[in-house]
Amino acid sequence: MILLNQRYYAMYEHHPSFELPENSEEKMIWRYMDLPKFISLIDKKSLFFTKASKFPDPYEGTIPKHNEVVRRTIYEQVKPEFESDEQFDSFIRSVPKIFGSILKQYRELMLINSWHFNDYESAALWELYGKETAIAIQSSINELKDSFTKTTDTIWIGKVNYIDFNHEWMDEWNIHEAFVIKRPSFFYESEIRAITCLPDDHIDKNISCKFDVEREKKPISPQHSVDPTELTTHGKYVKVDLNKLINKVYLSPAAPSYFKQVLESIISKYELNKEIIKSDLYTLK
């Protein structure tokens, strides 16, 4: 926590469930967006964190199918703690329902802001955002961490691991892991996630971000009450220091010649002095 204007603010906090690539603090990260989202960012001075339940991937925040296949084998080591085989069998049968219920609630609580981890621009992501007015913010993991100085939210940052849901096990006792795994089809995203959590009063009182039965893992604490002006049905806005967050602003390689001047005019109105570079990804040198 830091003290700012006589008020305590939360900021980036390490959490063992959310790991970063080794020696990655100075590595570049990118956030691709269209022009309206960029204007929203600089106007609100906030990053938008989306509820996990609102992501288009239906596997977001779920347990891999392979867990069902190997669950009994994995839990055999704790079988002696049960009074009978019947009790153990009952436990195994109950696990999918228990975790299914918890994850359903977590998908509403966990809020995610996605970044691309790469030393270079991504041709795939330029194509995905495709329009001539697409924009990419260049930052670094350290700059992202340092930008969360104007919020009461605690922010965690971690890399996404790409696993085969049909053949790989996820530690289901660490529920948080479900929000940093994706299928290999998304590997091109090379995703880094900033993550925060809604307070308990936005969901079932029996489930909150405090839940974590794996003792050696640090629980996620519930957050402060949310300013209703920051909250939407899809997530919430989190205040950031734009001067710390943004290193450079890149324009789409397909951007028309006048677009750089338009963007310079826009950011000057917000007193944001950042270099604007048109991508030369498709320029023969």
Where are these regions (language model features)?
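Partner-binding and oligomerization surfaces adjacent to conserved cores of proteins
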Residues: M1-K285
